[in-house]
Amino acid sequence: MSVSTDTILRLDLYNREQVLAAPEPRLVRQASVSFGRPTVHPVRADQFTGLHKLRPDLHRKQFLLVQWPFDLEKLPANRRYESMTVDIEFDNEAVVALDILPPAYDAPGPSDDETVRIDVRGVGRPRLAWDLCPVDPACGLRPRSRVMLVILDLPADVVRLTGTLGAKAVVARRRLGRFDTTTAESQTPAPFELGIDGTFAILPSASSGSPV
């Protein structure tokens, strides 16, 4: 699989922790997700099989396969990922997921097939998500390179897509011989712009996402 692995965005994930003598809980950074540059591949209508070929609106549509690489930050030895969710939401409600595929792998090593439970959400909608959980929580998720895959269904006259990236993780930390879990998430989704020609940019925002 040929996709760019250059880091273009890092989403820092925070939880809120109560501090003694502090009136309000404070934000504590727990982990991060780094995203590479997405690649775009046109999908022809004649490549479809089954019911998709019978759609009466095919002449008014275009379809794109988008590959989007991401990496989990490597955690200290006393911490592990017990789950991770990465989500994409498009601003144009006419841009929807025709199909969402489990993450592929852009680095050598064994696949997640037997060690990770993967759920995908959002077919037919402009908001889609990948949920990753280890089959054995005691092992955690490995911080390896993965690639999100989605086939988008959009109007034929659309040339540029805008939307946001977000992420959430459950992180376990060992304290005094036991693991405590906390949910950490990006504070504000990071806005982006993606052209059907593959051009891509992170847009200015007050987000906690950090362009690299």
Regions found by a protein language model. Name each.
Residues A97, A104-P211:
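Membrane pore-forming effector domains from diverse proteins
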